[in-house]
Amino acid sequence: MKNTDFDSKRIARGYVNRPWLHKQVMEQYIKDNTLSKKLSHGLDVGCGAGLSTKALRLICDDVTGTDISPAMIEVCKEQYHGNSSYDFYVAKAEETVIPKEKYDIVTAAGMVNWVDRDLFLRNVSHVLTEKGVLFIYDFWITDQMQGSEKYTDWYQNEYLKKFPKPPRNEDIWTQEDLTEDFRMGKQIVYDMPYKFIFEDFVEFMMIQSNVNAKIESGSMTESEVREWMKKSLQDIFVGEAKTLIFSGYNWYIYKR
């Protein structure tokens, strides 16, 4: 799957309405790093529709978001128009422009699977302040719904068979993978619950990378996928909102 597969209005608009679990992630960062006051400047690489940039703004006075997709950056600029604390521009993760004032923190949410690691780390080193932090994190929907074995069966035996995951690099970085100017700190994994109503869950699943791959290959249309989702899930999402479980990880990497 190419990075440019994310370059579509449909996906960009869908990203705006993703669950804002990034806030919980940032709260965990504050706890783990004993942050007592806001940082000055933060960079969010691979910012998507800006939800991760919004989370970074919780701990920074000013934030910059970059993404390889012009469609994503266009949505970001629309969402945060008129707010001088935000800046966005199109760039590869490996080609961030060196700012006048270097960043205290760089966040990378759900994007290191797609980068050239060595080039990315070299670029981050150039834009980070001394003792700055590279905070890499991700979270994803799992096959778990509170109180529902039917959902687990659907996820494993229907969804993943119809929409297999596209190939990606899912290696867990270690100190040996880092360039000499970085030190690997704590790496944690955790779960986060989130309540969905039926319609919102369908729309959320419509922007998963394996669903995007199926649509972009031409083997199914967007309307066909949405109809399949609704029919196959209707007996699972009965009544009130359902609590789905997300899994995630945080990696704290410090510049020496």
Range-by-range predicted roles:
Residues 1-37:
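Conserved class I S-adenosyl-L-methionine
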Residues 40, 61, 104:
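Conserved acidic residues
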Residues 43, 49-95:
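Class I SAM-dependent methyltransferase SAM/SAH-binding core
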Residues 97-106:
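A short acidic, Gly/Pro-enriched loop at the edge of an enzyme's catalytic core
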Residues 105-118:
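A short SAM/SAH-binding and catalytic strip from SAM-dependent methyltransferases
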Residues 119-130:
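A short glycine-rich, Lys/Arg-flanked "PGG" loop and its adjoining helix->strand segment in the class I
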Residues 131-196:
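Conserved catalytic/acceptor-binding region of the Class I
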Residues 173, 177-256:
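Conserved Class I S-adenosyl-L-methionine
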